[in-house]
UniProtKB/Swiss-Prot annotation:
Source species of the chain: Spodoptera litura multicapsid nucleopolyhedrovirus (SpltMNPV)
InterPro entries: Papain-like_cys_pep_sf, Pept_cys_AS, Pept_his_AS, Peptidase_C1A, Peptidase_C1A_C, Peptidase_C1A_papain-like, Prot_inhib_I29
Stated name of the protein: Viral cathepsin
Keyword annotations: Disulfide bond, Hydrolase, Protease, Signal, Thiol protease, Zymogen
Propeptide residues, chain positions: 19-126
Disulphide-bonded residues: C147-C188, C181-C221, C276-C324
Matches recorded under SMART domains: Inhibitor_I29 (SM00848), Pept_C1 (SM00645)
Amino acid sequence: MYLIYYYTIIAVATASIANEKIFYDIDSASVYYENFIKQHNKEYTTPDQRDAAFVNFKRNLADMNAMNNVSNQAVYGINKFSDIDKITFVNEHAGLVSNLINSTDSNFDPYRLCEYVTVAGPSARTPESFDWRKLNKVTKVKEQGVCGSCWAFAAIGNIESQYAIMHDSLIDLSEQQLLDCDRVDQGCDGGLMHLAFQEIIRIGGVEHEIDYPYQGIEYACRLAPSKLAVRLSHCYQYDLRDERKLLELLYKNGPIAVAIDCVDIIDYRSGIATVCNDNGLNHAVLLVGYGIENDTPYWIFKNSWGSNWGENGYFRARRNINACGMLNEFAASAVLL
């Protein structure tokens, strides 16, 4: 039965390598859909909304079959997003705006505060694998919800890790503060990580998450200067011409905010994604580590779609293929005071 098989796949979702192949019988889509609704406690306002979601679900099943057919090291399957069409998903659950250059401040220079760095030079010695999580330098996986705020989560995730490296202590900082107080990025309509860093410098710092909790919708700025927990001195945009330099930078300086095309990972369940195309950057994630499994080198990314997506909120993608277009935009990192 599907239900038994579905829970079996969930059980292996965090295995070190995804050897299981999933194939969904499209003719049984309605059975899968009913189980999906129960598993994820889905509610639809009207019968028409339910029917439209089923159309999306059925189309996504075909996408999962196609990805599983061409992927021998990753599993793609039903998850909590499977009733959303891909275009809507990117609009509601991603949020990178690569052409964002305007500002409410007419004197704003988008490169004024973040130093532009082309990383070159001879290769440095690095270990075969490295994971900042194992050093307790990465905070918990968070969930952006129906809000194009990935840019804020990637930026704050970078700052949290930089703080942990500097102070040997994990703290959770406020993404909501960026949604409300950042005058350059566009809140739930998207933004860029380096602009977020620059706005934090302008604002004066960032508060603890507990003092300025995430709402997933924009409100008036209610910043309390006395509660600022972390301040930044400056920030970097890295122009990385090859993945070896990115690996060295990650190992030397800590987790890095990067831009990707997320379309091919929406249905990701586990394993190493060896197919992740770049049809336009639309999402921001935090690069936290790298490794090798069964002779396949991979990156480890922290996402902001909750811990019940992917490998406990993370995904892995093959190295040295510019997976998901990860080298097509500047990587970014903050420097703390």
